[in-house]
Amino acid sequence: MGSIIDNLETEKRNINSENIDIMSTCEIIKTINSEDKKIAYAIEKVIPEIEKLIDATYEKMLFGGRVIYIGAGTSGRLGVLDASECPPTYGVDASLVQGIIAGGYGALLKAKEGAEDSLTLAKEDLKEIKLNSHDTVIGLAASGRTPYVIGGLDYANEIGALTGAISCVNNAQISQHAKYFIEAIVGAEVITGSTRMKAGTAQKMILNMISTSLMIKKGKVYHNLMVDVQPTNKKLIERSKNIIAECTNSSVEEAEKALIDSGNQVKVAMLMLLTKKDKKSCINILNENDGNISKSIRNIP
């Protein structure tokens, strides 16, 4: 009798890599690259499902809701990674998008024995951050069957939070525990069962779509520029000056002065140059337009 994972797409052997142990270096990387090409096509097939989850999540965010990713192992690490990039890129509070990994942050570097097999641990973790009905919990599990994720989704459903699930198998168990589910079928891994590869890449690409779309909808992007970037190092300071200069048809020197005068707030600096008003007035304009720079510029008195 086979094991409970035998029929999962993520556990099947890949016929294209069965002899990878005797391949040359060039053959190995060509095989990996060939398999990786399939990922974007797999995601393309589930774009309607991704869209539904994004729109439903954004509706929750309008009422103060947060986005919480939960997962174990690679899936958990990817959630933490995506969440941690939101504050520096879009200037949002670190609590708005959070990643929770089974076993805690120590598990980012070293797996914690038994954490992913617990049906109750995620509930405790979600209680710790005071999960509420305005929030969205998105469970990540390449195999679609991680108990930690299932337990977390069940608790989120219980308190009325929105739930989503991302997996890489058909008819995933976690899909049955979420209102919205995404099953990106990338096929067997080059190394059997190594879901840090194609499945992990697929999950990261989907998370990129989710977080980026949400931030765009929140007005954190002007055209395709990250106007809420936090200028916390030399590279980001230069990027901020360039964004301000480009959006206001100003010189880099004028942009630099406005950035300093605004207290390193890119959107405020942009409005200061466009309206010739002071920092306080421009902050008020932004506040009147929900912090959305596009709306603020359209509604400049």
From Swiss-Prot:
Coiled coil: none
InterPro entries: Etherase_MurQ, Glucokinase_regulatory_CS, MURQ/GCKR, SIS_dom, SIS_dom_sf
GO biological process: amino sugar catabolic process; N-acetylmuramic acid catabolic process; peptidoglycan turnover
Pathway named in the protein's UniProt entry: Amino-sugar metabolism; N-acetylmuramate degradation
Record bears the keyword Metal-binding: no
Class of enzymatic activity (EC top level): lyase
Keywords: Carbohydrate metabolism, Lyase
Iron-sulfur in keyword set: no
A single MF term (Gene Ontology): carbon-oxygen lyase activity
Signal peptide positions (record): none
Cross-referenced CDD domains: SIS_Etherase
Domain SIS residue range list: 57-220
Source organism, top-level taxon: Bacteria
EC number: 4.2.1.126
Catalytic site positions: 85 (proton donor), 116
Catalytic activity: N-acetyl-D-muramate 6-phosphate + H2O = N-acetyl-D-glucosamine 6-phosphate + (R)-lactate
Assigned protein family: Belongs to the GCKR-like family. MurNAc-6-P etherase subfamily.
Miscellaneous comment as given in the Swiss-Prot or TrEMBL entry: A lyase-type mechanism (elimination/hydration) is suggested for the cleavage of the lactyl ether bond of MurNAc 6-phosphate, with the formation of an alpha,beta-unsaturated aldehyde intermediate with (E)-stereochemistry, followed by the syn addition of water to give product.
Chain's role: Specifically catalyzes the cleavage of the D-lactyl ether substituent of MurNAc 6-phosphate, producing GlcNAc 6-phosphate and D-lactate.
Subunit structure: Homodimer.
PANTHER family listed in its UniProt record: GLUCOKINASE REGULATORY PROTEIN
Stated name of the protein: N-acetylmuramic acid 6-phosphate etherase
Native source organism of the sequence: Clostridium botulinum (strain Eklund 17B / Type B)
